[in-house]
């Protein structure tokens, strides 16, 4: 592995072709910045993940630049569009003229000082291109690309590691992980996003240092875990998190699913962990994050509700409600937004209702279809079935009902309101709400031809109540 040579390996690659319009705009903006830096005599390259993606012939999300220019020199070149948000660390954000949403991070070559908090260096000193790459996390991310001649510069062995699909720390793995403990999770994330195997020394250090992950901010842990779950290999991500020891620290509720038996007649696949793992493997490409988390958490309440009947049958009574409360606590701990928490916990709480769908009253079924979370719930149900018995008949039934019923039939405007009830002498309170709910259920079941029919029913309902 090359880590000490003063001269990099150089590889000429084909010119990069951008497919998507939004990426093309970002790329063109980065090229303009590089052009300005080169024109004024500065060394400057595309760096990091975007170079890795270009080498792998995939499309980067963003384009970062590393340069010999100091932050003040960068600011002087782009006086109206530079934001020195990371000036103390040599980082400048350069925004595109006319579109502030398009921006490029421009960082000065640097050496990092000691990482006293396990997150950021205590200070930096400006350095050479080689010194800059030697402080980076993984070899695949420690590449520079000179766009003037389409040449990749590699001081750390990143190019052969990409070719072999190996994730390897730059230099000493333990040092890299201690510098920034989030790299423990990033190693798992890159492995499952890129389809790489984690090199043995890197893996050993990851396992030894796993306990330090608890010092990282919950929001940053949440974001890395979400990227793992939404990667092409979420089931493998779960296994890597478990095998490394990270799962027991970050998500002990999920770790507890291992060894939790299930009734074999309904779950021939095995314990709850195996079921959850199989479901993760059934997620669609690039899934919605709420769906991915709902899959992970849907059976989180099973260990706490495990019981056996006298005949030995395993039961998990009310596990969906216990699980929803546990999911809420977990998601709150990871600082999810209120909307995300409500959406995901609703999916956990409601996932057992699907088995009853073919026998539901029309009103109950329509209310189910009208839930704002129903699309996620339906996909969760489909994946739940694929993760055990494979019977998708209820899923097909609900898809058919969605096709048969339009939005007005599923969730019509109520024919009656609270004022209608109160004019008949019923005060605001539980009884009023109960009457309106009865009326809406009847409306959903097409019991009323029009509003007048609903008013007639209401009068009879109130009279019968007051006799």
Regions found by a protein language model. Name each.
Residues 1-467:
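Catalytic cores of the polymerase beta-like nucleotidyltransferase superfamily
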